[in-house]
Amino acid sequence: MSEARRDSTSSLQRKKPPWLKLDIPSAVPPTAEEPSFLQPLRRQAFLRSVSMPAETAHISSPHHELRRSVLQRQTSITQTIRRGTADWFGVSKDSDSTQKWQRKSIRHCSQRYGKLKPQVLRELDLPSQDNVSLTSTETPPPLYVGPCQLGMQKIIDPLARGRAFRVADDTAEGLSAPHTPVTPGAASLCSFSSSRSGFHRLPRRRKRESVAKMSFRAAAALMKGRSVRDGTLRRAQRRSFTPASFLEEDTTDFPDELDTSFFAREGILHEELSTYPDEVFESPSEAALKDWEKAPEQADLTGGALDRSELERSHLMLPLERGWRKQKEGAAAPQPKVRLRQEVVSTAGPRRGQRIAVPVRKLFAREKRPYGLGMVGRLTNRTYRKRIDSFVKRQIEDMDDHRPFFTYWLTFVHSLVTILAVCIYGIAPVGFSQHETVDSVLRNRGVYENVKYVQQENFWIGPSSEALIHLGAKFSPCMRQDPQVHSFIRSAREREKHSACCVRNDRSGCVQTSEEECSSTLAVWVKWPIHPSAPELAGHKRQFGSVCHQDPRVCDEPSSEDPHEWPEDITKWPICTKNSAGNHTNHPHMDCVITGRPCCIGTKGRCEITSREYCDFMRGYFHEEATLCSQVHCMDDVCGLLPFLNPEVPDQFYRLWLSLFLHAGILHCLVSICFQMTVLRDLEKLAGWHRIAIIYLLSGVTGNLASAIFLPYRAEVGPAGSQFGILACLFVELFQSWQILARPWRAFFKLLAVVLFLFTFGLLPWIDNFAHISGFISGLFLSFAFLPYISFGKFDLYRKRCQIIIFQVVFLGLLAGLVVLFYFYPVRCEWCEFLTCIPFTDKFCEKYELDAQLH
């Protein structure tokens, strides 16, 4: 039997042509440490074709090789919390998310802060941000493979032209790539590892018909009097073969099932290879092989594209002996033929789900943001430095972009709130000075007077300052009991305590005034206890009063009965909702027609007893139910929103973050949207919505708190502090990527120029520089604490942990100090206004109707 086999083998060897030589690698027995299906990975030369781009071969373990994992003890809650916290802050030792973050940071740095160092670019091998050029649709150039690498040489497929158009859907990016010629009946390891191999090239399932097409076909069948089912059955009967897509599950899945008949016998191999043109597969002569062995070592040009001149000289893309073209006479002699060692690829079709998944990946494909080279980096022409550590390179490659959900949500809220504010409260006069309105209005004395209303113009095209305060602007008197405002209200109540009802002699009306404002000739000032109508309290006449249209003797609700008698001080009297007597009480202050009631005017809690016409002209809040200013709380009317828990003590501290969602006008909102859709969106794609939201909100709150301390009587709106906190993130990102940037100082000064320009822009009205400064400082602290960054070693990792703790403590100390200054130790700063608004004219910064000096 063995002799017969030897005879057949020798006969096959005699039939083998002299130019054919095959080097079949011998099988290596599997070791005890590694599974057998991983052994082919040791020799990467047999995992791919030379005509294909190099890819990392990855073969999944077959199902029958999987073993049940050993039972392990479940991690404790403390360890889970500790690991999750380390992953969130980016200081975990073995966290995949940390590596992804670091690789993403490098990509962002390359876009935002300029070029990287050349070594960084070489080791990172970042993908190009440009679109696919037209050259990618042409035939890819042949690759050069050194002669000493397992005998693999140049392999040129003259039929490879136009492959980019045929296989562009194999990758998510749609990039073209050369493909190995398909040999039926065999499969290779590369066909399982490469997403660009011919493993995914079976005929696909027929696309399902759309609803519109099926509806149209059903309507046509009904018009013809046929059944839709009959047509479907007739079409199904035409098929006499099984669709190829139904056999996808029967294709080769694992290396154990590879068809090795291709490598079995030399005779069969020669018969199969003889069917291919000689122009494609060529082998060198023995003399040429000996010359190559004696030749000196060549430079490592593996994977490089051949020059056009070399291609023309060697005629690699043209048939050498026969074909559709002939070699030109006088041309250089072709290179000697070399032995071929090429991988054979299976013809298995695409896996299930690729038809839809690939177009979807193309649709949602986005450019990744290199760390430190985002949008601002592209504007400032930043680059990476030439050299970078391989550990840093891996961190950059692992980074993935986040979706900017917070930016989109914030932009939607800003736009919606601005539109509603403008529609409800209208637009104030546009400009940089003050707008004055003069009109003749009926006052509380019963005569018409010329009055003037002064309003600060708003160049942002938006509501007035009073409307913004009512909406939730940053305004200290609404957030705490301001000493000056409280003193102003107390002095007004003290004057009202000694007032009385002034009844005109012609019975035209009465109004609550002081003795100086009541004419002794034309009116009578009904003052208790001098006037005989004074009531008694505890056996003696009351010392303060009277009050127009209010008397404890005739009020039923609330009644003045022992032990709930009304106090001596009229400023503590309640509002009478029901009187027992009619219009005739024989008391002059009760039988007259009242012409003035309390009206809250301005934003400082000022109250006047005046007519409704005058109150409406001054844009005030008229109280028809009250008779004294002490019975109303003007600060509650001015501030709006939720009422105070104690009417005497404002407590709307939530204005610190509520004002971040308000804008002074349409232009102000557009500026914020532009900032958010460029800088904020770019950073959120790098760091994620949770980190950016924390930095954005806390920076804005800190900036508004500092502004409320130094500019307490100015209404400020907008996310000024938050925006400067986000700009601080750019500085932190620049500092963290300082070691990998080619020109870090240049990027630093460019970024500093942008911040100084925005700070100068804050000297205009309605823009708060105190919020800018405080938001920037707090943003620096928060960015150092919450933004993970690229680590350059174990020491740098430990330094990051200390940095997180230190900057969190510093930020909490800053926030606590500002809270103490705001609520317990108010600061009075006279020159602080010049830091946020320079008075170029006498009315350029005229207090916005919010005077720092209350009078």
From Swiss-Prot:
The lineage of its organism: Eukaryota, Metazoa, Chordata, Craniata, Vertebrata. The keyword Endoplasmic reticulum applies. Coiled coil: none annotated. One of its GO terms (biological process) is protein transport. GO terms for molecular function: growth factor binding; serine-type endopeptidase activity. This is Inactive rhomboid protein 1. The keyword Transport applies. Residues 433-655, 713-714, 768-772, 825-855 are lumenal. It comes from Papio anubis (Olive baboon). Signal peptide: none annotated. One of its GO terms (cellular component) is Golgi membrane. The modification Phosphothreonine is found at residues 180, 183. Glycans are attached at residue 583. Homodimer, or homooligomer. Interacts with TGFA and HBEGF. Interacts with EGF; may retain EGF in the endoplasmic reticulum and regulates its degradation through the endoplasmic reticulum-associated degradation (ERAD). Interacts (via cytoplasmic N-terminus) with FRMD8/iTAP; this interaction leads to mutual protein stabilization. Interacts with ADAM17/TACE.
